[in-house]
């Protein structure tokens, strides 16, 4: 297995109120809209050079269905309404995540992708980034709007959440995205989640074409995959 060097840091300053993971009440009260976010935007630097776009194929892995969402503007929407038949990079996060190689890393890589996509006319027209919260209890549309404002997207980068767990769970199951609340011995929720970092690449037919975990989540690789799918679509326009 090839090693990767972490050259990106993602630091979420929670402040004294959330410094102790043992204080459930304080963790629950932590509000990202009032906290100081500091992201050193970067990515993993893999010890290999990705192959040239179009020199390989990305066979479909799975297909996802449409799901109800709430946009950062508070309006009801759906996954497919956001993607609109375009290539999509979809990531699941929660705004109070403090694991550097978790949600902050995902957001940092999507931030780099956003800038690169905006600088390429074809990518800007045919690619959408979608960040969805798996913490509907705290990550309201207003909170997702704060996150969007922080990143100030240059391309079409959408931020969304769900109304409740009833809408969230089928969405997570469809993507095979494991998420579980971390609880104290007495069963009380710590305010944190155990989750596996996954970022999904969807084609225009909502088929999963790649899944990036910590060891593969590199903006250069994702961009190469996007260009590979665009080249393939030109060869097979139907």
Would you name each region that the model predicts?
Residues 62, 86, 93-96, 101, ...:
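Sec/Tat-exported extracytoplasmic proteins
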Residues 164-225:
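Thiol/disulfide oxidoreductase modules built on the thioredoxin-like
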Residues 62-64, 82-89, 124-127, 139, ...:
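Extracytoplasmic
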Residues 24-46, 142, 157-169, 194-199, ...:
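Periplasmic c-type cytochrome electron-transfer domains
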Residues 60, 82, 96-106, 137-141, ...:
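Solvent-exposed, acidic/flexible segments
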Residues 78-109, 129:
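Short active-site neighborhood of thiol/selenol oxidoreductases, capturing the structured segment around
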Residues 1-66, 70, 238:
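N-terminal targeting signals for export/organelle localization
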Residues 105-171:
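Structural microenvironment flanking redox-active thiols in thiol-disulfide oxidoreductases
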């Amino acid at each position: 297995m090839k090693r990767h060097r972490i050259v990106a840091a993602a630091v979420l300053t929670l402040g004294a109120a959330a410094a102790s993971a043992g204080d459930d009440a304080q963790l629950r009260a932590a509000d990202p809209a009032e906290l100081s976010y500091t992201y050193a935007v970067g990515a993993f630097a893999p010890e290999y050079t990705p192959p040239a776009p179009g020199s390989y194929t990305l066979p479909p892995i799975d297909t996802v269905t449409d799901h109800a969402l709430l946009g950062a503007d508070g309006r009801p929407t759906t996954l497919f309404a956001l993607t609109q038949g375009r290539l999509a990079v979809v990531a699941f996060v929660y705004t109070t995540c403090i694991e550097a190689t978790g949600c902050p890393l995902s957001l940092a890589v999507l931030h780099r992708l956003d800038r690169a996509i905006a600088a390429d006319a074809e990518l800007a027209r045919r690619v959408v980034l979608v960040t969805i919260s798996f913490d509907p209890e705290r990550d309201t549309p207003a909170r997702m709007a704060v996150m969007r404002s922080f990143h100030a997207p240059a391309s079409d980068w959408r931020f969304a959440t769900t109304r409740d767990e009833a809408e969230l769970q089928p969405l997570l199951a469809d993507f095979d995205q494991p998420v579980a609340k971390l609880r104290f011995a007495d069963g009380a929720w710590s305010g944190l989640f155990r989750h596996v970092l996954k970022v999904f690449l969807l084609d225009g037919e909502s088929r999963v074409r790649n899944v990036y975990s910590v060891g593969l989540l590199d903006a250069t690789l994702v961009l190469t995959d996007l260009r590979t799918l665009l080249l393939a679509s030109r060869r097979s326009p139907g």
